[in-house]
Design a protein with these regions (language model features):
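Bacterial N-terminal signal peptides that target proteins for export
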Residues: 1-9
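C-terminal motif of bacterial Sec signal peptides marking the signal peptidase cleavage site
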Residues: 15-19
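N-terminal "domain-start" segment that seeds a small globular fold
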Residues: 22-49, 74-75
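Short loop/turn microsegments at loop-to-beta-strand junctions
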Residues: 33-34, 55-56, 157-159
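Short active-site neighborhood of thiol/selenol oxidoreductases, capturing the structured segment around
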Residues: 48-70, 76
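Structural microenvironment flanking redox-active thiols in thiol-disulfide oxidoreductases
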Residues: 74-136
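Structural micro-motif
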Residues: 122, 134, 141-146, 155-161
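Thiol-/selenol-based redox modules, centered on thioredoxin-like
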Residues: 148-192
């Protein structure tokens, strides 16, 4: 009988601890990101260390995009506004350029300004080789980025990625159509 009670207590403790490990996100992905240091829209170094201790939302865009990047960026702006309205602090937004040769810091600054981006917590990143962003996106965000040899349009995913304070991707959401803004805000709050 004592053995059975001890087993039940142990099981309950394991379940409780495993739930804590998910940081309040059900079925958290826990994809750990590798360190990075790139260049932001202000031509300053910006990297994972700058995001340490903060929850952040990432996406992959480029300024020359003819279709999906415009609505994605508009949706990220909506998310930034909603987070501010909800009084959420310690939240950052990161847009990785998938066309770094074209997307200089100046070009990214102009692009973000067209959407009234608040650059105090929204960082548009460049300053890496095309191959590097393609590999980083695949290895750590499990998404494709591919610039064809001909043409100027880059193939890339359209998801938003929620990253926790330790640099782990916890969840992803559509960033294009019918974006679940309320769910993302709820999940951001659950991580804080």
């Amino acid at each position: 009988m004592k053995l059975r009670v001890l087993a039940m207590i142990s099981l309950a403790a394991i379940l409780l601890l495993s739930a804590c490990g998910q940081s309040g996100i059900k079925n958290a992905l826990n994809w750990e990101l590798a360190d990075f240091t790139y260049i932001n829209q202000d031509n300053e170094e910006f990297g994972l260390k700058d995001l340490e201790g903060k929850v952040w939302v990432a996406d992959f865009i480029f300024t020359n995009c003819e279709d999906v990047c415009m609505p994605m960026t508009a949706n990220m702006k909506k998310l930034q506004q909603l987070a501010e309205e909800e009084g959420i602090e310690n939240i950052e937004f990161v847009s990785f350029s998938v066309d770094p040769k074209v997307d200089t810091p100046e070009v990214l600054k102009e692009f973000g300004s067209q959407y009234s981006a608040d650059f105090s917590n929204w960082h548009f990143l460049t300053g890496y080789a095309q191959e590097d962003i393609e590999q980083y996106a695949m290895d750590y965000f499990k998404t494709i980025v591919k610039k064809p040899q001909t043409g100027d349009q880059v193939i890339h995913g359209t998801d938003f990625y929620l990253v926790d304070q330790e640099g782990k991707v916890m969840k992803y959401y559509t960033g294009l159509a019918e974006i679940p803004l309320d769910e993302i805000i709820k999940d951001i709050k659950a991580l804080q």
